[in-house]
């Protein structure tokens, strides 16, 4: 206090002032804004020591001119000394007026040196002209603290400025980082307040209390510049200073505004975290307070969910509300509203209880000595509000409280309470027993527990499932060492010594008994409310009594402390003494739980499971010995029989004992399979199978339907066949209960023939296993054969029949014999069998013309049932024939998609198997055939093979016509030539066009190398085919080449740019397509004949004869042929529907392509350049038996089987029908597949760009974690409908960039894998045009953005799998899809919901009602088109803020920021926009039309007179029927589709003057007459002439038609 008196009554110097501020009260008023108060204690001591040696001089009392401040007198300043003062600068202000300090004068007149202005400088002298700051922190003794309502402004500073008392000011610290500026401003404002400048600090509304003077402004500027270096200022502060470098007040105003906002949020969070409620205030007020805080935080972007809010509320509950912590913590989905419902209920109950309870006042002395807060607590309150809940609830384990005991309890035992007392009793402490009640029990208490809070009483516990006491005095019928597991609330085991009964004798003279456990290891004697409820006794805490359900009061309840108690005087004592409690004889009369009761209680579990669970203590409360298991074995629960009814267990081999007495073909199994959908009417949809029980011989018959007559015909046939062929009679036929077997017609037939029908029982398919397993085996074989051969689906039954023939010939591992051997038949002659789908050439014995070819390509199916011939499918004639006149095509093996068999052929094996049939062809027939071929210029097939040591010029030596050297006499070099499996061409999508994006009708691409072959019946095609002779390699090189990927085996030899070759024209007179055949003279034709007999010369011939030698050039080096780009080697062809990129002449084009159901990377029918060899035709004496399959021409065209063209037919097109069918046209494909963009792309530069785009897309997929890379799934384990096919597509964008995209085949996606109700929205064109118009009228900035791989940001909810990309090389695996891949049905909707949610929640946007994908707030409008965004705003900074938020979540690329005031060009959704803000906007498509129209292959007139109108007015279209070839019709429809599609796109974008003509012609797309085509060409010509026209908008001007 001495220091305080000194500062108030005696004048002191600056130095002594520093030393005098040592009072402890200074620290109690410490300002919270001062963060370095604790660091100045050493400075106090040092300054006190230094100033104690100085003399004190009285301060001047002169009053300055400024009425608000007092100026100090100038004093001499000693030289600066920094030695003894290493602390921060402590400057003491002499008076409150800063204008007198020369240090803070005009910026250009500041007399200081750098070391004097350092924050570490401390002026030791008392006459320093610089202000000194004391080491102590806080409000000075002579200055009142700021008001609590305004932290930053001292409202009394204006009055205190007049005082002459000295003030001790501490400077703010130096600003060292822009992030520390908010905290630094707080210290700077405190510095101003301590400098008596609190009145100039802006308040919350931005205005100071008083006007600032010039001197104060100078002081403000200089101090701010000193302590806040410009390089550490935030950007917004620099922006303010850039406008006015002295505008410190604006900086302070904005800082205070920011701090107020942050302070409010911080205060709300602190308030919410420190909530306290005990019912002292109304519950409504508490709820309003909490909900307002939560709403305010949510509005400020701080989201408080229900779980966090409830936890914060419950943590602050006390008193009677405290139990909600325990009852509500198990509710996972609890809401704030539900919690407040409970709080309101307790509050209302509390208010009612206070009105009904007598008021017992405590003695003041008791309140002073007892600091416990006695309030209602936890679990007993639950019973009071909901008694029924306790009656019906049981805990899995018995729990007991383990509450720490109190040592303040007296040793007196007095629990005698008046029986007539029914009023609630409230005991605040043990001294409140002054109502005539005694705390001593009248009975003998053998154990004195002095630690009980209320001795002689039982604690009522709603959480305990068992009653526990520590004394055995009240236990009746006790049994020792019970096997009971009891745990407390902390999961700790409580050892139990005995179990018995606890008997009560209540005040209504009724007796009740409950079970009780004895243990000395608990703090209180616990009375379980659950066990009381089991005997119809409940605790009413509103009346504080125990009562029955009829309202009879049994005993009062005493509340002491936080718990409720019942006196032990109602317990009946037992006759057992305490010392012998562990020796009590075990009572065998203890009643056990009946097993049916336990069975029902434990959810009807079986006895074995229940017994095992009790034995291992997984179920507590009772043990295995407590259950009566005597009836468990024989007990039959009727509910289990009904609810758990199952089928009987099928015993394996049980049927065999019933068939032991049957002979072969007496017991048959039969079953029907089908239907197979999407087949032509001529193909069967069902088949019926029969299996003999004894021999396991199998028969299959095709069915077109399941009618009674059809089934009866089959039964008649099979029975007659068995009777006549095997001399056996069928006795029993086993079948299922299908309607085709249970009908009356078949039943009568079987009854008439004495056959017993044996039906399976209901839903017992396993009893019909023989027939079921046969059907499954045959279908597996069918799918495999169709997949291997590539044949179309309508031949499925042929595959079934082929499999049946083979299966009957294979031995069974069980019987060691085949079915044919059991039936007494000979084994299958494999020399008569061909692989299913083997390509063959069939002789046409009845051609339409003598000059037409007589060989028809076909595919072998199976041996004939009715002849010695073979059933062969002829795609060109759309039928099957039974014939022996066929020739096997060597090298044309079945297509094996999944394996690389390119280096393998089965020609030698097939020759060896069929060698026995070679003798059927006489030599004179061969000679006669050769002579005929020479005379008619017919060319038989020859082998063109290469010499391994001559890669440059390989010449094929001609052989004389009489040479009949068989294929087996070939040299070793010929055997070394690798032969490639020639596979059936795959099905090609009919909607894919080859000329959809290029100007010419035929796409320019590298041609595929065809295998040269002609049939034995003659006919030569004049085809100009570039034949490439591949290199013959050594064995080592050949094996290495075979290990390469099959997808790239032709890539190097197909390129015209990399290979030199000679065109080898192969003439033919039987071809029908002569459009591209060059004119060749007869002499040249004779010279180029390749004779039939094959021969390989070991060395190049010395003399090259011009009439029998074909020169072939090959690449110069072996490495040049086999070299592949390293990057392409890692890019195998994906599983895509292959299509030949170019239609080129193929001499083996007669071999028809076969439709396949699955995709494959191999291009069907393409192999190495080895030619095919023929085998001598197999002749039989039997006539051909032709079975025609009637397939409609539409089906033929849909399958797109390009082979020998059938006779061209005319198609009649009706105008009205064509106009009505316009909507059914499918869109044109505008993208490239992998093989088109990379594999067969001969444009090297374009190919490299597509490869780069491919790798970029793969890296993006991995970056976005599109699929789960941790686990790969087997294709067989996944539901097929959840497997999505994928592919890579390539295209070139409008800006010239090449793009690759990995997409899913959504067109074949199963409907169960997506929600059809979800929609992907894009901005409507009119919405975009409206936004552009508003932007022009309001001088908006237009910013264009693009989000890369937008769909991949959206998660996918469904469980979907895709095949891995081709570069992973795992064709047999699947990966789990995690992101919305492009192409999926739901991807667009998922992305729209994702970006919509982000724009609304994070960017503060709202979707415009009526226009989806248009979002708006007060400053910015956004138009969303999938991954493109167009932003409109008045202020460009608003657009930038949105961009920054988007970049935080998405890979956002700015296409055009739009910040220039000059003309800016945009390309928005195909529109070329030129925009100058505030002046005009021009919309056009000149660049796009200049690029696209020439590619349409339309005859343009670029230099002629321009058209003045898009069409001739008043012209009517002729309605005569259009008669046109089908191929020509498709070509013209395809052309119309491209032309009208482009015109419609342009018209609806901005060329509205063309829409009438466009819509009229669009109705005639399917009626491509010459007149319609001419009108369409005229429209395109007009668009070409006016491509530079633009739609021009001027600001505040309406557009006129002249602008178009």
Swiss-Prot record:
A motif (Bipartite nuclear localization signal) lies at residues 1178-1212. The modification Phosphoserine is found at residue 416. Residues 1-23, 48-60, 127-152, 1005-1015, 1054-1082, 1101-1111 have a biased composition (Polar residues). PROSITE patterns: ASP_PROTEASE, INTEGRASE. Residues 1-93, 126-174, 352-421, 956-1087, 1092-1111, 1130-1187 are annotated as: Disordered. Residues 153-165, 402-418, 960-969 have a biased composition (Low complexity). It catalyses: DNA(n) + a 2'-deoxyribonucleoside 5'-triphosphate = DNA(n+1) + diphosphate; Endonucleolytic cleavage to 5'-phosphomonoester. Residues 660-835 form the Integrase catalytic domain. InterPro entries: Aspartic_peptidase_AS, DNA/RNA_pol_sf, Integrase_cat-core, Retrotran_Ty1/copia-like, RNaseH-like_sf, RNaseH_sf, RVT_2, TYA. The record marks 401-402, 582-583, 1217-1218 as: Cleavage. GO terms for cellular component: cytoplasm; nucleus. GO terms for biological process: DNA integration; DNA recombination; proteolysis; transposition; viral translational frameshifting. Mg(2+) 2 binds at residues 1346, 1427-1428. The keyword Hydrolase applies. Its EC number is 3.4.23.-, 2.7.7.49, 2.7.7.7, 3.1.26.4. Its main location: cytoplasm. Initially, virus-like particles (VLPs) are composed of the structural unprocessed proteins Gag and Gag-Pol, and also contain the host initiator methionine tRNA (tRNA(i)-Met) which serves as a primer for minus-strand DNA synthesis, and a dimer of genomic Ty RNA. Processing of the polyproteins occurs within the particle and proceeds by an ordered pathway, called maturation. First, the protease (PR) is released by autocatalytic cleavage of the Gag-Pol polyprotein yielding capsid protein p45 and a Pol-p154 precursor protein. Residues 1038-1053 have a biased composition (Basic and acidic residues). Mg(2+) 1 binds at residues 671, 736. GO terms for molecular function: aspartic-type endopeptidase activity; ATP binding; DNA binding; DNA-directed DNA polymerase activity; RNA binding; RNA-directed DNA polymerase activity; RNA-DNA hybrid ribonuclease activity; zinc ion binding. The active site is at residue 461. Pfam families: rve, RVT_2, TYA. The capsid protein forms a homotrimer, from which the VLPs are assembled. The protease is a homodimer, whose active site consists of two apposed aspartic acid residues. Retrotransposons are mobile genetic entities that are able to replicate via an RNA intermediate and a reverse transcription step. In contrast to retroviruses, retrotransposons are non-infectious, lack an envelope and remain intracellular. Ty1 retrotransposons belong to the copia elements (pseudoviridae). Capsid protein (CA) is the structural component of the virus-like particle (VLP), forming the shell that encapsulates the retrotransposons dimeric RNA genome. The particles are assembled from trimer-clustered units and there are holes in the capsid shells that allow for the diffusion of macromolecules. CA also has nucleocapsid-like chaperone activity, promoting primer tRNA(i)-Met annealing to the multipartite primer-binding site (PBS), dimerization of Ty1 RNA and initiation of reverse transcription. The aspartyl protease (PR) mediates the proteolytic cleavages of the Gag and Gag-Pol polyproteins after assembly of the VLP. This is Transposon Ty1-DR4 Gag-Pol polyprotein. It comes from Saccharomyces cerevisiae (strain ATCC 204508 / S288c). The gene is TY1B-DR4.
